[in-house]
Curated annotation (Swiss-Prot):
GO CC, any one term: cytoplasm
Gene from which this protein is expressed: ureC
List of catalytic residues: H325 (proton donor)
Top enzyme class: hydrolase
Pfam families in UniProt: Amidohydro_1, Urease_alpha
Cofactor annotation comment: Binds 2 nickel ions per subunit.
Protein's UniProt name: Urease subunit alpha
């Protein structure tokens, strides 16, 4: 016997379904559900009087030890927002990995069951929630361990960078120099609440200077102008990278002392490289570094300080830059060095290039001009700003922004994972990957997550007073949970190293307890592999006016005076926020 209910009632009970559109936070972005993999009338739902009970939605006979389809955790009826699509499904997690996405339940009484809920299964209600892959920040200065918690609080679960603490070299460059420092930082990573990967310092005129750092456990190399971004340094770093299958990140020569951007492109020679803060305010060939975004072998990223372009960007940047790069405001040459990097024309063009898909990755440059806890928030602020200024993307409409949403979520999930050689492990919601997942209430999307899973275990989330009678009593704050307690912290987190270090037992050599995994398939990556962000238009920058043209057309935008996901979320009692969430059929 069938029973019909309204879409509003259905959304209240089981969450939105196919054809419904959800507003993301207080932005003007709407995610339309493309498909629903659960079965109407057979939805799995936990609670008193609900169906996930013994002999009903929960199998009374299937054993975990005998049947690999029996999961450890089911997330029910979640809206998955990923580069693979925007859809609704149950998520099945076993041994810390996503083993099934579809319809979970009891195959004895339910049709079309993709994975089994048994007596061994925990339930997490995803009805009305959005689930995304944990964010990946590829531009992190390891200045203080506290950055990891700021990252988690905005949904970032993997950080890649370098440093040794608040040394001047680390304040400036994201590299950990030498085998001893790399080993110490690998040991330090044992206590971190996020996945980590370390970049060695590129330099020297022979391969061995960088090779010994890759062999010591660095997962990548970093070329930075403050240590010398000479053409020889770039060439030798890439030689090492090709030999060991690792990435090279490039902060190029702002002063053009050893060559211009064309010379750097020539020294790269068609090899894969990751270009940091490609607009140039964070550093790199002035004023025309953005030309590299035209090349298929160069993976261009942005950093959060200049995204989105607002009325406060320019005055904030000069002082930040002076501090981060150890410059002296009393020395005129240092001031001119800083001034050369802050150009409103290229900053304005950066927003548009991001929206076009010509810039592939978003990152933070944390504590060295950027804020690690704002990567995800600023990505969605930028997407909102671009929709308001440029209109819907091709194929989108007023209440359907799926193409733009897939473009922007790819910038901090799957694309950095591909660029750094870790996409087999993290970066998307796909079967076989580790369950590093972020759960959001739609009204809070992009600003403050509800809960964060690391390798399938609840690690961080909003929790009430621990002496209260229920878990939702004020004050409700983000807190560490059992996934980050005791030895579980090591078990649910990953340290990424070079394949050489992995095969030569770096884990055993250093006595590491974390899940140590090798990076691979890096050197064959091109910009065409960047999901929804693979455009390679011809980009030119006028050396006198700094105007930016794309395929001969001037591109720019106005600075924003007001942004979503801002003070409403940071200085308001969150329980009193009332943001309209749309669950309606879009025809």
């Amino acid at each position: 016997m069938s029973f019909e209910i309204s879409r509003e009632q259905y959304a209240g009970m089981f969450g939105p379904t196919t054809g419904d559109s959800i507003r993301l936070g207080d932005t003007n972005l709407f995610a339309k559900i493309e498909k629903d993999m659960t079965v109407y009338g057979d939805e799995s739902k936990f609670g008193g009087g609900k169906c996930l009970r013994d002999g009903m939605g929960q199998s009374a006979t299937e054993l975990r030890r005998d049947n690999p389809k029996v999961v450890d955790l089911i997330i029910t009826s979640a809206v998955i927002l990923d580069y693979t699509g925007i859809y609704k499904a149950d998520i099945g997690i076993r041994d810390g990995k996503i083993v099934a996405i579809g319809n979970g339940g009891n195959p004895s009484i339910m049709d079309n069951v993709d994975f089994i809920v048994g007596s061994s299964t925990e339930a997490l209600s995803g009805e009305g929630l959005i689930v995304t892959a944990g964010g990946i920040d590829t531009h992190v200065h390891f200045i203080t361990p506290a950055i990891a918690y700021s990252a988690l609080e905005n949904g970032t679960t993997t950080i890649i960078g370098g440093g040794t603490g608040p040394a001047d070299g680390t304040n400036s460059a994201t590299s950990t120099p030498g085998a001893w420092n790399i080993h110490q930082m690998l040991r330090a990573a044992e206590g971190m609440p996020v996945n980590m990967g370390i970049q060695g310092k590129a330099g020297g005129a022979i391969m061995d200077t960088t090779a010994e750092q890759i062999e010591a456990g660095a997962m990548a190399l970093k070329v930075h102008e403050d240590w010398g971004a000479t053409l020889s340094c770039i060439d030798h770093a890439l030689e090492t990278a090709d030999k060991y299958d690792v990435q090279v990140s490039l902060h190029s020569d702002t002063l053009n002392e050893t060559g211009f951007v064309e010379d750097t492109i020539k020294s790269i020679g068609g090899r894969c490289i990751h270009s940091y803060h490609t607009e140039g305010a964070g550093g790199g060939h002035a004023p025309d570094l953005m030309k590299v975004a035209s090349k298929n072998n160069i993976i261009p990223s942005s950093t959060s300080p200049t995204n989105p372009y607002t009325v406060d960007i320019l005055p904030e940047h000069l002082d930040m830059l002076m501090v981060c790069h150890h410059l002296d405001p009393k020395i005129p040459e240092d001031v001119r060095f800083a001034d050369s990097r802050i150009r409103k024309q290229t900053i304005a063009a950066e927003d548009v290039l991001q929206d076009m898909g010509a810039l592939s990755i978003m990152s933070s440059d944390t504590m060295a001009m950027g804020r690690i806890g704002e990567v995800i928030m600023r990505s969605w602020q930028l997407a909102d700003k671009m929709k308001k200024q440029r209109g819907p993307l091709e194929g989108d409409s007023e209440y359907i922004d799926n193409n733009r949403i897939k473009r922007y979520i790819s910038k901090y999930t799957i694309n950095p994972a591909i660029a750094e050689g870790i996409s087999d492990y993290v970066g998307s919601i796909e079967e076989g990957k580790y369950a590093d997942l972020v759960l959001w209430e739609p009204a809070m999307f992009g600003a403050k997550p509800k809960m964060i899973l690391k390798s399938g275990m609840i690690a961080y989330g909003v929790m009430g007073d621990s002496n209260a009678s229920i878990p939702t009593t004020q004050p409700r704050t983000m807190r560490e949970l059992f996934g980050l307690t005791g030895k579980s912290r090591q078990h649910v987190n990953m340290t990424f190293v070079s394949t050489y270090a992995y095969e030569h037992n770096i884990k055993e050599e250093l006595g590491l307890e974390r899940n140590v995994l090798p990076v691979h398939n890096v050197r064959t990556v091109t910009k065409k592999d960047m999901k929804f962000n693979s455009e390679t238009p011809k980009i030119e920058i006028d050396p006198l006016t700094y105007d930016v043209t794309v395929d001969g057309k001037l591109i720019t935008c106005d600075p924003a005076r007001e942004l979503p996901l801002a003070q409403r979320y940071l200085y308001t009692n969150l329980d009193k926020i009332n943001i309209l969430v749309y669950y309606k059929k879009i025809t």
